[in-house]
Amino acid sequence: MYASVADLVEQFGETEIVELTDRDQAGEIDTAVAERALEDASAEIDGYLAARYRLPISEPLRLLTLLAADIARYRLQRGVATDQARQRYEDAVAMLKRIQSGQMNMPLATRPPAVAEPMVVRSGGRVFDDDALKGW
């Protein structure tokens, strides 16, 4: 996963994460619910990164942590997302699309191997040209 429950709390505050995850009304963060949202966010991110990077990314950049937190928060709001959460989600997806298309690069050590140069075949020239085949 690109982000942890602690990252969610750091970014959005414990009160909000309790409100978003506490489905049993226990008054505390439901870690399983939060981790599931973070796993889903990481899977969504991987969908964009797979075209340009070898997965899994073992040492993700802070950027991926922030994007994963925004995506997970949006998912946790289950259809009643605030305008701010929706905008942050849309911004995260737009950034992932830029990364996917190559408009934005991430300096990762896990890039896929470079494609080999295309094969080139050379010959010694034509044995039979138009002049040699005249009259046949």
Predicted features along the sequence, with ranges:
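Conserved short "hinge" loops at termini or chain/domain junctions
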Residues: M1-R62, P118-W136
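Ordered, amphipathic secondary-structure segments that act as subunit-interaction surfaces
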Residues: G47, A51, L63-T82
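Short loop/turn elements at secondary-structure junctions
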Residues: I71-W136
